From Swiss-Prot:
Keyword Secreted included in the entry's annotation: yes
The protein's name: Conotoxin tx5f
Keyword Disulfide bond: yes
UniProt remark on domains: The cysteine framework is V (CC-CC).
Keyword terms, alphabetized: Amidation, Disulfide bond, Secreted, Toxin
Any Gene Ontology CC annotation: extracellular region
Tissue distribution of the protein: Expressed by the venom duct.
Lineage top rank: taxon: Eukaryota
Length: 9
């Protein structure tokens, strides 16, 4: 998705 942000998916 948009590392390091995992929950953005």
């Amino acid at each position: 998705c948009c590392p390091p942000v995992i929950w953005c998916c």
